[in-house]
């Protein structure tokens, strides 16, 4: 059976991306230096917290474990933000750039089917994201080990990062397939599409609060509404899931009241964005097939 690596590198678009980005040591070094600059900040803040703890100020933080968690959670959230913002821009010129350079027609008349072109462009865009995640991941692992973070939390963080990278790269790729120039694709992605995905959940949470407060609904219904609205933004899904887990609930279902459970936002997030990824990639393939028929 052919390995995944051989299937990927057999795609000429992916092979070309790997060949040109082997010089990516400069990129890796840049991210590594950025994280080195970030580490002293965390360590300094951790030392400050440890000093405060030694003064018996009754702060609710442990020393070494709190320092590890102080590294793990902010670093994971920052990486999630970086992936969310950088993923579309790495894919937004994938197809629009070919149209702008008038090389897309040459690509379409090759023996590569449309789905192989889209897959190759997707993997090419994910290479840089893979570099970024790989550079930061050791710091996250150190924070998880020192902070005694549960394995299920590390698993959820990994799934959130992976699905976010795929979904938001697919968003950029879909917009790129519908645009004629890189400028148009970038403006459409960061001016309309991305705000709809990122700001929409906050507006949904605000709307849920106003509606349920107006009809005098109880806290349980409000919690259900907030949890569901928070499930469509990577940051709110991660934070609300952590808060629910920290309150003593499981990582699949959280108990709001005795015998009443609510599904964790991260599960809804994964399901929704996995579907969005499949849908947008399918639409991008259809778009290329339509252009090939013209």
Task: Kindly give the residue locations of the regions a language model identified.
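Hydrophobic alpha-helical transmembrane segments of multi-pass membrane transport/permease proteins
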Residues: 24-52, 191-197
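Helix-loop-helix units of permease transmembrane domains in multi-pass membrane transporters
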Residues: 14, 94-126, 130
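Secretory targeting signals
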Residues: 123-182, 188
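Long, hydrophobic alpha-helical segments
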Residues: 71-97, 101
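Aromatic- and glycine-rich beta-strand/loop motifs that create alpha-glucan
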Residues: 1-32, 283, 288-293
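Terminal transmembrane helical anchor/hairpin motif
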Residues: 50-52, 198-279
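Alpha-helical transmembrane segments of multipass membrane proteins
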Residues: 37-41, 128, 132, 136, ...
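Hydrophobic/aromatic residues in alpha-helical transmembrane segments
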Residues: 87-91, 139, 171, 284
């Amino acid at each position: 059976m052919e390995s995944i690596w051989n299937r990927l590198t057999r795609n000429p678009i992916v092979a070309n991306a790997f060949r040109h980005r082997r010089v990516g040591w400069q990129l890796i070094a840049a991210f590594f230096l950025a994280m080195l600059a970030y580490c002293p900040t965390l360590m300094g803040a951790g030392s400050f917290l440890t000093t405060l703890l030694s003064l018996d100020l009754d702060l609710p933080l442990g020393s070494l474990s709190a320092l590890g968690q102080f590294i793990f959670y902010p670093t994971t959230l920052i990486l999630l933000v970086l992936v969310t913002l950088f993923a579309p821009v790495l894919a937004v010129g994938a197809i629009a750039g070919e149209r702008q350079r008038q090389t897309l027609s040459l690509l379409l008349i090759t023996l590569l089917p449309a789905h192989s072109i889209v897959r190759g462009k997707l993997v090419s865009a994910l290479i840089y994201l893979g570099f970024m995640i790989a550079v930061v991941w050791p710091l996250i692992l150190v924070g998880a080990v020192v902070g005694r973070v549960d394995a299920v939390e590390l698993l959820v963080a990994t799934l959130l990062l992976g699905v976010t990278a795929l979904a938001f790269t697919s968003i950029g790729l879909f917009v790129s397939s519908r645009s004629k120039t890189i400028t148009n694709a970038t403006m459409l992605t960061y001016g309309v599409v991305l705000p709809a995905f990122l700001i929409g959940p906050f507006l949904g949470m605000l709307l849920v609060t106003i509606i349920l407060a107006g009809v005098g609904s109880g806290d349980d219904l409000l919690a259900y509404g907030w949890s569901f609205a928070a499930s469509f933004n990577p940051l709110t899904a991660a934070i609300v899931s952590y808060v629910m887990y920290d309150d003593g609930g499981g990582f699949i279902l959280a108990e709001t009241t005795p015998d009443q459970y609510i599904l964790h936002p991260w599960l809804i997030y994964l399901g929704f964005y996995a579907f969005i990824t499949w849908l947008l990639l399918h639409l991008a393939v259809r778009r290329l097939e339509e252009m090939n028929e013209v």
